[in-house]
């Protein structure tokens, strides 16, 4: 971008501020002393305007939002007549919406299956499919699976493993592979 374009968009020192922005600045100015307000740049003032707008939007939506720090200093009544001295969230530093993440977890149960946690703790559990830890051999449990274990094994979300591992684990008999020789090798 050309640097001249940025200069054109910036308001000049002696230029008029739009009426809407001036009203927003006046709403924010009451929270600062005259010296603080004069020292602030226009960008800082705009940031405070947006902070106040976001706070008002959150409270209108029904969230229990805390006052922004600059609004706590004066504790003046806002334009709607609400007294900030009576705000129960005045001393809190963190915003707490009505539906926190912990409450959402209570409403919506975890999606992760419980079976993997049991396998790690249970020594009789169904062993994993062949892999480097058991030297390529497929292990089977000593007894048959009961119906509840079969249901837990087949139902539920996928665990991110390969699609064929489920089928390999349920085979009843071991498959033995033989080498098929070429007819040319047999002639020798």
Swiss-Prot record:
Residues 179-188 have a biased composition (Acidic residues). Residues 78-188 are annotated as: Disordered. Residues 112-122 have a biased composition (Basic and acidic residues). Residues 156-170 have a biased composition (Basic residues). Residues 20-83 form the KRAB-related domain. One of its GO terms (cellular component) is nucleus. GO terms for biological process: regulation of DNA-templated transcription. Pfam families: SSXRD (PF09514). SUPFAM superfamilies: KRAB domain (Kruppel-associated box). Keywords: Transcription, Transcription regulation. Residues 144-155 have a biased composition (Polar residues). The keyword Transmembrane does not apply. It comes from the Eukaryota. Could act as a modulator of transcription. Belongs to the SSX family. This is Protein SSX5.
């Amino acid at each position: 971008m050309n640097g001249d374009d940025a200069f054109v968009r910036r308001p000049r020192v002696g230029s008029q501020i739009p009426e809407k922005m001036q009203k927003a600045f006046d709403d924010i100015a009451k929270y600062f002393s005259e010296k603080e307000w004069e020292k602030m740049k226009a960008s800082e003032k705009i940031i405070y305007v947006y902070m106040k707008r976001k706070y008002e939007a959150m409270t209108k939506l029904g969230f229990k939002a805390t006052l922004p720090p600059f609004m706590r200093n004066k504790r003046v009544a806002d334009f709607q007549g609400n007294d900030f001295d009576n705000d129960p969230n005045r001393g809190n530093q963190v915003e707490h919406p009505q539906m926190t993440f912990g409450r959402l977890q209570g409403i919506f149960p975890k999606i992760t299956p419980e079976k993997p946690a049991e396998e790690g703790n249970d020594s009789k559990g169904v062993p994993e499919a062949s892999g480097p830890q058991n030297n390529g051999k497929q292990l089977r449990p000593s007894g048959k699976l009961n119906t509840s274990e079969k249901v837990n094994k087949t139902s539920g979300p996928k665990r991110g493993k390969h699609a064929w591992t489920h089928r390999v684990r349920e085979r009843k008999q071991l498959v033995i592979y033989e080498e098929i020789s070429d007819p040319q090798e047999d002639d020798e």
